[in-house]
Design a protein with these regions (language model features):
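Residues lining hydrophobic/aromatic ligand-binding pockets adjacent to catalytic sites
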Residues: 1-193
Length: 193
């Protein structure tokens, strides 16, 4: 008889305008031992407690590790031949384009490896996951059979559901704008650059 293996889970969290104490309280409430910072720019004027220089030191006092993974960060621009036209937000469209790269896949596999070893949370600034690139990262994890849950509050954990715009082919995920009657179009079809 095979032993039951535990499910790999990835949590996500947005630091938002929380105090460091509130943030750590949430991490501790959900047993997080590693924060993976998925911000491209890990600093801000309004919440300096979450800057890359300060946060690792603060978290260490609570026994929580920190790593920064800018290679999976947001702030991506759409490609000219993007197939991810279902996204109206250019930042999400650009990130969906980036998800087609080997760099994204390698970073995602690194996150999965870490999640198999420890309880981690992917962190960005935006509190609401559906307004953040964590939502797209979560889609990519979900199609790889990784359970994703979003930390909203102390008593609020939301299970990630694959975005309805998603088109899945194995572990490849795109967000095309198409119907059964019309073929997929790209930005190039509209003369956009």
């Amino acid at each position: 008889m095979l032993a039951k293996t535990s499910e790999t889970v990835v949590l996500t969290i947005g630091h938002s305008t929380r105090t460091l104490e509130e943030f750590v309280e949430l991490l501790e409430a959900y047993g997080v031992t590693l924060v993976v910072d998925v911000r491209t720019v890990p600093r801000g004027r309004h919440n300096p407690q979450f800057n890359k220089e300060a946060l690792p030191i603060s978290l260490k006092h609570f026994g929580i590790r920190y790593i920064h993974m800018p290679e999976i960060g947001g702030l991506r621009h759409p490609k000219h031949e993007s197939v991810n036209l279902a996204w109206k937000n250019s930042g999400f469209q650009g990130y969906a384009d980036y998800m087609q790269t080997q760099e994204f896949t390698d970073s995602l596999l690194k996150i999965i490896g870490l999640a198999r070893e420890t309880r981690l949370a992917l962190m960005c600034a935006e509190a609401l996951p559906w307004r953040c690139h964590r939502n797209l990262i979560s889609d990519a994890l979900t199609v790889r059979h990784i359970k994703v849950e979003h930390i909203i509050g102390k008593d609020s954990l939301i299970k990630h559901e694959l975005n309805e715009l998603a088109h899945v082919d194995g572990t490849r995920i795109t967000y095309p704008l198409f119907t059964k009657e019309t073929p997929q179009r790209t930005l190039g079809d509209f003369g956009s650059s």
